[in-house]
Amino acid sequence: MATVQMYTTRWCGYCVRAKTLLEARGIEFEEISLDDDLGFRRRLLDLTGGWTVPQILIDGRPIGGYTELWQLDRSGELERLAA
């Protein structure tokens, strides 16, 4: 099974949606909360190339945020990547 990591904040509605989607598909993930990281936007940009949350990585490969996750799910690609 792939390693899925998601960078989140508690105030982010799209983070909740992404977690719900992954849980509904039975995909385990590591949630990395950035609530106490004042420099989180710089950290995200360095790690993923994006500065918004959520930022999701599958096996270390940045896939983007909720919209990209949803698109992968709709196309069936998420299941393949997460296997």
PLM regions and their residue ranges:
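Local sequence-structure signature of Cys/Sec-based thiol-disulfide redox active-site neighborhoods
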Residues: 1-28
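Non-catalytic interaction surface on structured domains
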Residues: 17, 21, 25, 46-47, ...
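Conserved beta-strand scaffold positions in the cores of enzyme catalytic domains, especially
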Residues: 26-31, 62
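Thioredoxin-like thiol-disulfide oxidoreductase module
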Residues: 33-51, 77, 81
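Structural micro-motif
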Residues: 48-57, 67
